[in-house]
């Protein structure tokens, strides 16, 4: 909220500690339990509304306000441990006060400049160049009622406070998804709430519902892996709303563009400016959890999460895409007619498969992809993960040794007939087995005689069994 030229950001949870103050004045990662190596404070740069809000909460850990999906009972969720970067506050303010129930401190650029002038070390510095977060003074003011810590920024003239709040409101839903310790954000009376619950069927997957801001609600599936969480928004039917383009988040956005269809929030080590992945970061486990995200979707929607090859925006995007493709290629997630969820490399797809044809072929064509996923639309992405395509000729070949009663063959022909439009399809089915009157199979209908009187059986006539005619 805003009062005059003061921007207030308050939270609940663990209060400010002496170690935290020392870390803030040293401009390094804050000494907080569970802190991830490689997370560092950001430097002065162009800061967005999201950075200001997240950086202010970095001054104190947030306690467990709501049970998060996949949470650890022994380690409470935290915001500050991520080192979002408290130095972002210095880009819009010359005075920053941290009011906490354990004690309060004040950073003041003018007072710092006065101290520098007093000891005669100002040199070529100007008052504007003096670092804000180096010297700290004690403050006697406590946080607002109902909060454990409050950050008060006296915003410089010329900065549009209303515009800053509008930006924060726009970014609040994403911030709730990225910082899992948060359950609610209120920005000048505009309230956002997130509700998390575990998925009823898939372990390590949950749903997150974000409400508020006058925009209704948005639902997300969230899968947790070793070094990343994977998210995809879903519509009212549960189908994925695939991301067109996004950036890697750790947990808030970096500058690394991603072309993946799902959002990635990683714990990978970053460079000091928190904009790039550290050169020594281990990407081997980043795809862990992606398969669980796919399994949480309805079978017909799962191929939507297969990454498109050749669209990588940068080397990190290419590496993560390759890891995800390897996970998807080797995993058991593709719904098949007879075998449940199967491995793509052992599956075959017949484009425009119908339910009657699937019922007839399911136990004869191993790994036949189910009807819901047999649209030609999915064929290019399914090929990328090892799925083979089968046509009418392939079906005929695979039925060469089938031992089925004549009535079964009649049902098969009936299921195939809507797919035969002309001589091309007839030629493709030229070797389709036909049961004969003598109990044997004929490969194709050529050479078979059909009696003039329907239902007639004559052993001396080489014709199709009457039950299939």
Q: Can you say where each PLM-predicted feature lies in the sequence?
A:
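Acidic/polar loop patches that form or flank catalytic/metal-binding clefts of enzymes
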Residues: 98-108, 184-186, 301-305
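A generic secondary-structure signal for well-formed alpha-helical elements
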Residues: 28, 32, 93-100, 176, ...
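Structural preference for long, well-ordered alpha-helical segments in enzyme cores
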Residues: 168-176, 290, 294
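Amphipathic alpha-helical coiled-coil/helical-bundle segments that mediate oligomerization/assembly
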Residues: 131, 137, 150, 155-157, ...
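Generic structural motif
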Residues: 12-14, 70-72, 103, 110-114, ...
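GHKL (Bergerat-fold) ATPase N-terminal catalytic module, capturing the glycine-rich phosphate-binding loop
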Residues: 1-153
